[in-house]
UniProtKB/Swiss-Prot annotation:
It is found in: Cytoplasm; Cell inner membrane. CDD domains: Era, KH-II_Era. Residues 43-47 are annotated as: G2. GTP binds at residues 17-24, 64-68, 129-132. GO terms for biological process: ribosomal small subunit assembly. Residues 129-132 are annotated as: G4. It is a peripheral membrane protein. Monomer. This is GTPase Era.
Length: 308
């Protein structure tokens, strides 16, 4: 480092908020690449995904947490525990609130928990997302109400999808992190095994394709990852569903749904990995997968956190 060079900074930034608040979209926008899956359905993110972004001399490790909601199942409870665990471990917490939904009961519950868990050593900021959906006077009132409920260090108006305000937020985060060496190599954009990213990409395609409750009752695991001599990779994945009827829906007429999902997932994996991908999907019925520790381990969740 030269005498006049800025000191390096590094730290964790946890993005928290209700389901579908835009946390995964913001993570991807900050990193400049897709590391979290994004769909129009709520509760898509299940585990804590870490995306790594550079801002000048700062390395920002974004922790995209599952949405905070009232849990009903073991999986729900483990997801919420992972979200608050990510927040507790972070140097900076960013609460994301959807501008058009405003001060919901869910947001109030999160604010209440933030006040209960207040840590003087931790910075908490507010990011009001999707600002293009509301009028300025509505936005001003929401900003005042949220800041009256919690003493945020800073408030940002953003649209993660359209990129409004994202650069300003990233610059502030980089400047606010503690001085210290970088935690990851300069070219690393995620702290997630490739096997998990591959499974998440396939689950995203399933979630976009399927309807109602089925996306929440399935999981995808990468069973085999084989590097081939020609530079390509063979990926074998299993989709676990809870009922025979679910398997039929997922396969579709003459296997058309499964083929379409496989094609879409393979195309994105090729783009992500930069090489040829041979993707093979199997669908298996496993009625109690939601109660199996192995499934939670594969998703990066703590099975014990799901205890009632």
């Amino acid at each position: 480092m030269t005498e006049n060079a800025a000191p390096t900074r590094a730290g964790f930034v946890a993005l928290i908020g209700e389901p579908n608040a835009g946390k995964s979209t913001l993570t991807n926008a900050m990193v400049g690449a897709k590391v979290s899956i994004v769909t129009h359905k709520v509760q898509t993110t299940r585990a804590r995904i870490r995306g790594v972004a550079l801002e000048g001399a700062a390395q920002i490790v974004f922790v995209d947490t599952p949405g905070l909601f009232r849990p009903r199942r073991r999986l729900d409870r483990a997801m919420v525990a992972a979200a608050w665990g990510g927040a507790a471990d972070a140097d900076i917490v960013v609460l994301m609130v959807e501008a058009h939904r405003g001060m919901t009961d869910g947001v109030r519950a999160i604010l209440e928990t933030l006040n209960e868990r207040r840590d003087p050593k931790q910075i908490v900021a507010l990011a009001i997302n999707k600002i293009d959906r509301v009028k300025s006077e509505v936005l001003l009132k929401l900003t005042q109400d949220l800041n009256a409920a919690y003493p945020f260090a800073e408030t940002f108006m953003i649209s993660a999808e359209k990129g409004y305000g994202v650069a300003d937020l990233r610059a502030w985060l980089g400047a606010s992190l503690p001085e210290g060496p970088w935690m990851y190599p300069e070219d690393q954009i995620a702290d997630v095994p490739l096997r998990m990213i591959a499974a998440e990409i396939t689950r995203e395609k399933l979630t976009l394709r399927l309807h109602q409750e089925l996306p929440y009752q399935l999981t995808v695991e990468t069973e085999n990852w084989e590097e081939r001599k020609d530079g390509s990779v063979r990926i074998d994945q299993v989709v676990y569903v809870m009922r025979d009827g679910h398997k039929g829906i997922l396969l579709g007429h003459k296997g058309e749904t499964a083929k379409a999902v496989s094609k879409a997932a393979r195309e994105e994996l090729v783009e992500f990995l930069g090489r040829k991908v041979h993707l093979f999907l199997q669908v298996k019925v496993r009625p109690n997968w939601l109660e199996e520790k192995e499934r939670f381990d594969e998703m990066g969740l703590d099975f014990r956190d799901g205890n009632a």
